[in-house]
Amino acid sequence: RLLYAPAVEPSDMPILAYLGVDVFDDLNVELRSATSWALDDGSWTKVDTKTKDLQSQNREELDRWLLKIRTSIMNGTLRELVEVTSLHNPRVSQILHHSTSLLIEKGARRNVMIRANNLSLENPSVVDYQQRLSDYVPPAKNMVLLVLPCSARKPYFKSSSHKRFYNTIKEVDNYLALHIVSVTSPLGLVPRELEFCYPAAHYDIAVTGDWSASEVQMLREQFSRLEPEKHYLKAIVHAGSSSKIITELLRERKVDTIDTEAEKPSSFAGLEILQEFTRTAIAEIPVLSSKDRAKGEAIGLAKFQYGESSPFLAESEISGHMPYKLRCGDLATISPRVGGLGLTLAGAAKYAANGGPSVTAEDFKLVGDLFAVGVKSYDGHWVIGDQV
């Protein structure tokens, strides 16, 4: 079925399309044209003289505006168009704010790139990620937290700067006891195990080095979800221009924190400083084996993805390591396409048996993907992008 909204203001069309409206009409354009208003990129401007062809001009402009909306839907940029229109339309801003919780329940397409700005702090996918960080646990107790800056390339570990960071710290004895967490806006904190997960691997933002008050508060809330004081013995902050803020937030939580004060973290001098501080910080930290580290990575990632239903993965035979070779027996394996642990058929069956969501298909031989028309019923709670 199609959802139709009559006489809608053009500036409201992007937000209504974002929320599921399918069909609009030109009644509003007809009424506005009769009273000497000209449409320009979704907004109205009063004209002094009544133009003979104003009605046809406005219809053409409406066609261009609707084409812009359709194109943004196809390109996955409708959210960004909505955010732009909300900057000068308080009604759109209000609707966008109140729709966040509804859209979190619905879920999000996992291949949509988020082009972030300050308004993205309320993007449903961003809020959902931030809330689920409460389910995540670091790989082991008594580790040293290493906070690094984000990178333009996603996932971060593929970037040249993060490769330099890793090559530097792996020369330190017991480097597996270091836990890398990257700091970024609008997500806040991204542990290394979650870099494949949506939307951590699917966003882009202009890096300025400045943090707004709302972003600082977001970081504070993310640290309260991560609870570093419970999991880490120490913290090293090597995040460039963000280091001062991160250090203050960690010390608020009574974490023994070292700020390397390196202005250019990935420079030769910055890497030397990083290696020196990490070597000193983990000198007396209990040795963490690669096997225990891998098991902890799998548990943390499984809890983030599957919440209360995750123990069935943690109880399997964990092998391999991040980022590409982690396996949970014959139940799941790390998958960049899925964005985390991808279930096998055996894993999916066990997931459903342990309270995971499932769908019942019509009686036919399945070849390829299962579409909505072939679904008979479903059980459990799931949103767009979840595995069932």
Where are these regions (language model features)?
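Short beta-strand/loop segments at the ligand-binding rim of alpha/beta enzyme cores
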Residues: 1-6
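Alpha/beta catalytic cores of nucleotide-metabolism and tRNA/nucleoside-modifying enzymes
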Residues: 10-128, 138-140, 164
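Non-catalytic interaction/regulatory modules that flank or connect domains
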Residues: 111-178
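Structural motif
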Residues: 148-152, 236-242
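Polybasic, low-complexity RNA-engagement segments
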Residues: 153-155, 163, 276-388
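Short connector loops at secondary-structure junctions
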Residues: 175-202
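Extended, charge-rich low-complexity interaction segments
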Residues: 201-236, 279-311
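Peripheral docking tails and interdomain loops at the edges
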Residues: 242-291
